[in-house]
Amino acid sequence: METNSCLKMQVALTLLPKFNTQKYLTFINRCGGIEGFFHEKTHAFSTLLKEYQLSFSDERKSALKSAEEELKNLDLYDIRLCSVEHSNYPFLLRQCEDTPLVFYYKGQLVTESLPYLAIVGTRHASERCKIRVRTILKELAERGHRLVIVSGLAYGIDITAHLSSLTQHFPTYAVLGHGLNLIYPAPHKNIAENILRQGGALLSEYPCSSPFIPQHFLQRNRIIAGLSQATFVAESALKGGAMATAHIAASYGRDVMALPGRPEDIFSKGCNELIKQNIAALVEDSSDIACLLHLKDKKSPPQQTSFNFFDTGDQEKQVLKILTQQGCTPIDELSKNTRIAMNELIALLLKLELEGKIVSLPGKNYIIS
């Protein structure tokens, strides 16, 4: 068990200026370990800084003092630390030159040998793409696969990936760009709690005292990519966090995958470009992901057939029949034609959408998927 003093020094490392992790580790070893690093005399420390061509002021004392407050936060918010020298530090993340020396986490780090897949994309995800993400994860589960899904808890594709993981009982990691004493965006707090309840984790390289800075969200993308065997871009414009994550993953030598989209769709242009530049493999369905991750089916693959009305309840049959005959239909008209109470109809439509049978469109309209 680590001493309070050792934990304090690990926290203090996260409060010092950032530079190359491998250089930091070599530097610490030259000082005789983390304790030597923090207690090396000022003159000798300055000499080492010059030798390593580093120029930051000696902030070790102030970092140690601030770390005392951070330790209180660890207890208060049930947050733990993982150092790059710990045996449970994620293997793939450790291989990255810019891996964090220490990161904070809540929940459980998966010790089981499972493939890690990052799923990223725009915050303005289309309903059609969200359904495709849900369907892909559902089919992977039906094939008997179990994965760790990594994303960033943001709106759009991120939260769809986390929710779909929870539905399929996959552990999922949410990598955050702020301290773990808060959840952003706030409406996702309940989902974050469900992630913890279902054996996943929230991760951040930032201490609780770290201010909420937009640049942190770009920095955290390298951790999403670094944790993962492959990064899957579901939907993205030409610029944005998902594209940055894809390029970082490629720079690490990891596989990148993307869903193609219509050329005129602004949030398909990024995916199409990744495929066109041979940065990403084209993904059409779950079998493509299984192939790229070298997964062997443990169960019979799901049948790629359209749904059968006779597999559903009477109310579902009514809704599906109307949508098949009429095409795009507003919810008010569905309620009128089926005589299903509005509150029951809303629940039924959500169920059908999650099953990938229908798609919701703006203005509370619905069509067959």
Predicted features, each with a name:
Residues 1-88, 274, 355-357, 362-369:
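Short, small/acidic-rich helices and loops at N termini and domain boundaries
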Residues 2-4, 83-369:
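Glycine-biased, small-residue-rich flexible motifs in mid-sequence functional cores and linkers
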